[in-house]
Amino acid sequence: MSGNTYGKLFTVTTAGESHGPALVAIVDGCPPGLELSLEDMQRDLDRRKPGTSRHTTQRQEDDVVEILSGVFEGKTTGCAIGLLIRNTDQKSKDYSAIKDLFRPAHADYTYHHKYGIRDYRGGGRSSARETAMRVAAGAIAKKYLATQGIQVRGYMSQLGPIEIPFKTWDSVEQNAFFSPDPDKVPALETYMDQLRRDQDSVGAKITVVAEGVMPGLGEPIFDRLDAELAHALMSINAVKGVEIGAGFASVSQRGTEHRDELTPEGFLSNNAGGILGGISSGQPIVAHLALKPTSSITTPGRSIDIDGNPVEVITKGRHDPCVGIRATPIAEAMMAIVLMDHLLRHRAQNAEVRVATPVLPQL
């Protein structure tokens, strides 16, 4: 069965290709009465859209979202919310020379073997263009979560060899890299300019944080909250790794260092990333995701054609030298969608659960 839908109670279904006429989404399960405007979604879409700096693809898409259903007089009705974003700046001729070739490290080869047919224009369905609808749907989830005191934010924590320490949220929206350290921005710009001259690409690491999440979200065993987050974040194009909390650094930690001790004043650390036993602990939920270097580069690479003959491939078109630069709002959206779904699932089963133990304050 095709995997175009995510969620159990809050579901998001997307459709559309990179060079098709439009992208569409159906968002179902949103409670009625939520105040929702185009601006609520457009704000995040503008953070993701291409062509916003010299360091991203120069494809010019306005990414203007249209609401087709599910909203009346500025409020959600409880019915399915239909969304549409029209593609306006396709240049399909850029891909005519490679329609019978497989671009290295792309989905061309695997889509061909799975379906026997593929839209070669910009990668078709496998293109990161699809994530625009995730961001629109995620904005709805973020709007509802905010009414519950939950905030989801992200930032770039590494670009290539440059590690970016967290300094302030105020810096994140003030530069094209979503860098939380303004002092790192000049180095990032210099690195990206050199990368473009080298006709190469690079990967990145994104950190996304949810604050205000109450204890109890997550459905053991198979739908543990961390498992669901890993699933959702790994579904983003180019993501090759996900960590929750300390992640792989846990390997070198001792138990006395890793365990998050509890006191009446709160947890003493957050190596678990806000999730214990697959259930939210009330601490900030922290996830990191690694994105591979962009596969579309102008440096020639070896491959084969559809008949199995060796060829040399030079990818033309307009591409991001680092897909991670625009990935922060996408990661935020997917975390918000997961939390929204699990909030509704928890409420459906455990709305009457009450315990005397106080909820510990967040760090």
Swiss-Prot record:
Single GO MF descriptor: chorismate synthase activity
Binding site for FMN: R125, S126, S127, N237, A238, G277, K292, P293, T294, S295, S296, R318
Transmembrane segments: none
UniProt remark on cofactor binding: Reduced FMN (FMNH(2)).
Keyword terms: Amino-acid biosynthesis, Aromatic amino acid biosynthesis, FAD, Flavoprotein, FMN, Lyase, NADP
InterPro entries in the record: Chorismate_synth, Chorismate_synth_AroC_sf, Chorismate_synthase_CS
Keyword Kinase included in the entry's annotation: no
Catalytic activity: 5-O-(1-carboxyvinyl)-3-phosphoshikimate = chorismate + phosphate
Domain of life, source organism: Bacteria
Self-association and partners: Homotetramer.
Described function: This reaction introduces a second double bond into the aromatic ring system.
Family to which this protein belongs: Belongs to the chorismate synthase family.
UniProt protein name: Chorismate synthase
Biological classification of the source: Bacteria, Pseudomonadati, Pseudomonadota, Gammaproteobacteria, Pseudomonadales
